[in-house]
């Protein structure tokens, strides 16, 4: 699994930080979280294939998180896309996509399925054999969501148990692997009888724009998340601004990481007011002095982070 930060800025882009967008590559598929202006151009400088984007997750409908959609949707149409594209987002996402498709002379021939999430509670929005995705309602100036991507690990076959039960490699073992029970010497054998608990999979949370939420941290902990991408629009001296605009400071994000039990936190959505990251780095040093076990990084545009 690999995370690529396409844009790590906030409301106003800078020379060094584009509007928010994050790519997550898993099992040959690309999952895109937010799509700020310039996303499709940022992709050019990475190994992200826009044609492999099947799911786009929008945290909220502020322009800095969605204005890259019109260009991206049309560009992949020009490249010959035919397979459906799923777009997930909060209330009014359907209307926004309708407006995008109604402006200009678009030639989009592939299906776009829009999934509007209005739930005020956490929701599992995708479930497959290999991964699941959850939405979590957060607090911002407009309806907003956080997302969690979780790898699904299957139980591991315990060959010692298989041997002990006298199951030979063949049809019976295949049926067990497929989830069916097998009768052997008058005894019913189930998959649980011959497997070990699955290993812990990779789990990544993305806060979107939000105030620090203890409840979100608890949700991440419940899902056993090991990586958190959290907005850090301001440094802690701007705490008042963060509260007024319903954003988070770097210290807020770090504290949420600690509460959630993750091993890594990646800070993003940095305000254009900062010419350097000294204030953020000082907060990280203070935090690491008491929490050395947590890996902290400030994301930069086009930065890649691999997870195993």
Curated annotation (Swiss-Prot):
One of its GO terms (molecular function) is 3'-tRNA processing endoribonuclease activity. Keywords: Endonuclease, Hydrolase, Metal-binding, Nuclease, tRNA processing, Zinc. Its EC number is 3.1.26.11. InterPro entries: Metallo-B-lactamas (IPR001279), RibonucZ/Hydroxyglut_hydro (IPR036866), RNase_Z/BN (IPR013471). Zn(2+) 1 binds at residues 60, 62, 140, 209. Its cofactor is Zn(2+). It is an enzyme of class 3 (hydrolase). Belongs to the RNase Z family. Homodimer. This is Ribonuclease Z. It comes from Methanococcus maripaludis (strain DSM 14266 / JCM 13030 / NBRC 101832 / S2 / LL).
């Amino acid at each position: 699994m690999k995370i690529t930060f396409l844009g790590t800025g906030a409301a106003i882009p800078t020379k060094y930080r584009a509007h928010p967008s994050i790519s997550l590559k898993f099992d040959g598929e690309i999952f895109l979280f937010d799509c700020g202006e310039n996303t499709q151009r940022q992709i050019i400088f990475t190994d992200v294939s826009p044609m492999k984007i099947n799911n786009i997750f929008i945290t909220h409908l502020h322009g800095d998180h969605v204005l890259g959609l019109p260009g991206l949707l049309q560009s992949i149409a020009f490249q010959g896309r035919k397979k459906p594209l799923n777009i997930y987002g909060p209330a009014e996402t359907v209307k926004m996509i309708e407006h995008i498709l109604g402006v200009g002379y678009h030639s989009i021939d592939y299906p776009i399925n829009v999934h509007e999430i209005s739930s005020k509670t956490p929701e599992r929005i995708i479930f497959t054999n290999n991964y699941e995705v959850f939405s979590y309602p957060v607090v911002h100036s407009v309806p907003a969501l956080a997302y969690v991507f979780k790898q699904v690990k299957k139980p591991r076959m315990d060959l010692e148990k298989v041997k002990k039960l006298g199951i030979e490699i063949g049809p019976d073992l295949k049926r067990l692997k497929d989830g069916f029970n097998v009768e052997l010497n008058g005894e019913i054998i189930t998959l649980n009888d011959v497997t070990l608990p699955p290993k812990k999979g990779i789990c990544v949370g993305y806060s979107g724009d939000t105030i620090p939420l203890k409840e979100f941290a608890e949700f991440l902990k419940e899902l056993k998340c090991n990586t958190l991408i959290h907005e850090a629009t301001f440094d802690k001296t701007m705490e008042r601004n963060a509260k007024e605009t319903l954003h988070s400071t770097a210290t807020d994000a770090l504290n949420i990481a600690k509460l959630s039990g993750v091993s890594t936190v990646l800070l993003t959505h940095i305000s254009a007011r900062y010419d350097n990251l000294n204030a953020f780095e000082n907060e990280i040093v203070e935090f690491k002095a008491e929490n050395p076990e947590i890996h902290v990084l400030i994301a930069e545009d086009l930065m890649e982070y691999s997870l195993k």
